[in-house]
Amino acid sequence: ELAERGFVTLAPAYPHLAQYRPDWAALGYVSGTMKAIWDNVRGLDVLEDMEEVRAGGVGAIGHSLGGHNAIYTATFDARIAAVVSSCGFDSYQAYKDGDITSWTSSCYMPRLRDYALAAIPFDFHDMVAALAPRPFFASAPLRDDNFKWQSVDAVAAAARRVYALYGVEDRLSIAHPDCAHDFPLEMRERAYALFAQWL
């Protein structure tokens, strides 16, 4: 859909999904998340070298795993000028009522196991705040059984204070479609409109 709208698109595979199976430990990575972030950053390097891509006009969009990886990558790389996350996050403390087991697999962030839940040194409110003043849109469905929309709102409320310091609170927006763990057309259209405005 983005390509049909004229956007140059790159959709990197996540480590150990589909056919992409790098040995991230042998490559020096502790987690699949950091390998994915590095792959995404290298993808930005490729896009940056393409004459078809406008300088400063790169966005990140993703659903579920792609949704939090859009946030992670944009936190590490300011070349991403706008970010969209669908069903991609809530706070670690709210996730599955505090059971972060799935976040601690080697595919994600195994070092989270080293911390008590309340002592994890970062959470999504920190990462979303770090995106400011860049535009950020999150679709957090009312019936998502993975990420709680109420927690998404709490994350956004905390991050919005940083957006306010920049005087751009309106650049952080959240929507709650009445669906399950999905990225419905109405939300995708809203995401594409954000990209059309900012990229």
Specify the residue positions occupied by each region the protein language model found.
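C-terminal catalytic histidine-bearing segment of alpha/beta-hydrolase fold enzymes
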Residues: 157-158, 162-199
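Alpha-helix capping and helix-loop boundary segments enriched in small/acidic/polar residues
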Residues: 27-35, 60-65, 71, 114-122, ...
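Catalytic His-Asp charge-relay segment
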Residues: 134-140, 173-175
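Flexible loop/turn segments at secondary-structure boundaries
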Residues: 17-20, 67-69, 90-95, 137-138, ...
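Mobile cap/lid helix-loop segments that gate and shape the active-site cleft of serine hydrolases
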Residues: 82-128, 133, 142-156, 164-168
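Cap/lid segment of the alpha/beta-hydrolase catalytic domain
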Residues: 1-49, 94-99
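Primarily recognizes the serine-hydrolase "nucleophile elbow" in alpha/beta-hydrolase
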Residues: 5, 42-118
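Generic structural signal for well-ordered alpha-helices
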Residues: 41-44, 128, 156, 160, ...
